[in-house]
């Protein structure tokens, strides 16, 4: 028999991305370049993770942080150090090689995520809308965090690129001067995980 305490000890899988007002999440778009306060928030967020799970495209974008750049300031070096220190799992059938502190996964993502949830504590982060769509379809994402920026892109990749889950808002927070973080959980999970928030 599994106790409630044991269930809560499972690591939480979070899907978090910057998003425009019209719902697009093109990660490399110049309008999403974070201001200092938001970048500091991201540094601390990455430091607190237990690991990261990426799709191919998002991992290739984030590999920018695997090598130092001459024009970096102190905070860029901080972020890079935090990112490099985290274990990463890269879901791809086409990649043949990956960087340090990363594991390539070609099949059975369901078993991978369930195993990581059982082994790790705290929070893991899922990166990339296509991967997140597959994980949503499997019912594996515990929280969705939208960093809503005051920009309109007009087109691009949507935050939800696959199934459209039933969600409930569980938190909202102003991050920096003009970015709002909206946190949603699958509606079916809210009564058990977040019931104390409404007391």
Model-derived features: positions:
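Enzymes that bind and transform nitrogen-containing heteroaromatic metabolites
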Residues: 2-199
């Amino acid at each position: 028999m599994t106790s409630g305490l044991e269930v809560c000890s499972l690591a939480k899988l979070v899907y978090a991305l910057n998003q425009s007002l019209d719902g697009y999440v093109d990660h490399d778009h110049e309008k999403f370049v974070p201001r200092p306060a938001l970048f500091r928030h991201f540094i601390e967020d990455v430091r607190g993770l237990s690991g990261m799970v990426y799709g191919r495209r998002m991992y290739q974008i984030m590999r920018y942080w695997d090598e130092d750049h001459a024009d970096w300031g102190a905070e860029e070096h901080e972020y890079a150090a935090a990112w490099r220190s985290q274990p990463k799992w890269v879901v791809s059938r086409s990649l043949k090689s990956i960087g340090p502190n990363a594991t390539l996964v070609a099949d059975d993502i369901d078993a991978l995520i369930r195993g990581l949830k059982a082994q790790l504590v705290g929070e893991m982060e899922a990166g990339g809308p296509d991967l997140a769509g597959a994980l949503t379809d499997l019912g594996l994402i515990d929280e969705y965090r939208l960093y809503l920026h005051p920009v309109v892109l007009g087109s691009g990749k949507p935050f939800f690129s696959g199934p459209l889950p039933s969600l409930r808002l569980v938190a909202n927070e102003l991050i920096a001067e003009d970015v709002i973080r909206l946190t949603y959980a699958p509606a079916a999970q809210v009564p058990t995980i977040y019931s104390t928030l409404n007391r």
